[in-house]
Amino acid sequence: MKLKGTITALVTPFCKNGTVDYGALKALVEEQTSAGIEGICSVGTSGESPTLSHDEHHEVIAKTIEYAAGKCKIVAGTGANSTSEALSLTKAVIEMGGADATLQVTPYYNKPNSEGLYRHFMTVADLGLPVILYNVPGRAGKEIPLDVVVRLAKHPNVVAIKEAAGSVERVSAIKNVLPDFTVLSGDDSLTLPMISVGAEGVISVASNLIPREMSDMVRMALAGDFAGALKYHRKYYNLFHDLFIDVNPVMVKEALWLMGKFERVFRLPLCETDDAKLELCGATLESLSIEAYRTVIPVPLRSFFSS
């Protein structure tokens, strides 16, 4: 299986009482598929996977598959820092059917050595569902070494890697030794540079807000129209930046709340951002003519970075 284009790292909306808002989830999925997105990643980092129970985890993925069936690729976030837990979550997705691949994060906190990483990912890949490796050292505390990626890429079910290390050089290094192995950007602001050295797309946070625009930008770049893609990049760069002025997925959920998509509810230890960041987010949306229904105090777009 070949993955390419824009895959949205979909958020998980909550009701006022803290339960999953499946009505809002359905609306989000329908908006994504109507915009022509290539894929949806359910219950990854942006989906607040660490605070979902296993039952909720299964249900959110199942509902996403139901709502998006036949309209785009579905990637299920089933990674964990325990191999047995990753196996359990992945087996549940295989049993429900409908997912095209799983996203497997680098085991975090316990920081396994290279051989442990290799065995972990290989064990999950042996289940049969295609695997996207997720290299995110800022969260995992450890990078997947290049030699381990090379070994894993020999497995027929290891089909791609999501690169969220903030390094175009690393993408170059991967493509230099694995020219046919799929690399997906994990950073919206680095998507164009990564495509320029061989990446095939992005697992995007910003596409929660601008799915059609992100898809258009990536398609242009993949078709070789970097001048056209660069216009999108420059137009939305401030948005890419501002979605990470607080920890993800706080700012993208704040933006969706400002747009009236769902309630302003997080699960601890995540919580709302501060007023200054919220105002900046609202100003960014307004500057891009992205409709915001809530009222925020108008501020100059870049005023918080002028000191």
Segments from the language model and where they lie:
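Catalytic alpha/beta core domains of metabolic enzymes, predominantly
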Residues: L127-L129, R139-F244
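Alpha-helix N-capping/helix-start residues
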Residues: K16, Y22, H54, L146, ...
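Alpha-helical structural signal in soluble globular domains
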Residues: A35, E59, K63-A68, A92, ...
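A general structural signal for well-ordered alpha-helical segments in protein cores
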Residues: L25, H57, I61, A86, ...
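Active-site beta->alpha loop and helix N-cap motifs at the rims of alpha/beta catalytic domains
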Residues: K2-G141
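C-terminal alpha-helical cap/extension of soluble enzyme domains
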Residues: K2, I7-P13, A35-I37, S46, ...
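Glycine-rich phosphate-binding "P-loop"
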Residues: N135-P137, N157, R267-L268
